[in-house]
Amino acid sequence: MSACRLGVLAFGDSITNGGGELQWGVALQSWAQWVARGLALPYTGVAVDGARVEDVLVEQVPRVPAGARYDLGCLYIGVNDVRRLDWDRAAFERGHRAALAALAERCDRLLTLTVPLDLGRPRAEGKVQEVNAAIAASAAAAGALVLDLRGFGARNQVMTDHVHPTAFGQIAIAERALDVLAADGMDVRVRPHTLISYETTRWRRLRGDTTYAYRRLKQALKAANVHMGAV
């Protein structure tokens, strides 16, 4: 890696922006930031909550000078696109290709991520297959590495909305990303899970289970109301 490189650059939405509640005392940080820490590289994150692929192109790309050069460019987008009623696979794929092209102009390596199949409440269902096919096609055209998150979704790794990763979920994504990058020749200096420390007790587990059950019920009722309103 050249000394003039600027480290890791990340485009995306709230998942890549990070931030949120502690989990067993562990801060919720972006998976991309954990990747940068694992690679011992500087991090530049321009992801914005609620972003869609169009927002990446219009708002995020212009924030990074065209002459800048990074070791790794990360793109995780599509969750907000695919959950909209006006979802358009062809338009998304064009936008995703353009976003990867913008990263390629600035980065030595590219990494993009697919979307978990069990996405959202109500579920996005078949549309998730479409967004993942678009991401795969875009990545192949750009020569980007792909982190497959289709099966991602363990209870302690995803919030009850089945969209946003927990603090442990962000770390789990980063660990998988580092596996992909290591296989491609990048030097992983430290594993994110070794950088955290937490302690659980019977009472804290019970409180956590109760909170999870309450939030899951709220989410289920909200999803049911959405379905009823759509009828």
Question: Which residues are covered by each model-predicted region?
Answer:
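Alpha-helical cap/lid subdomain in secreted, periplasmic
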Residues: 3, 34, 59-231
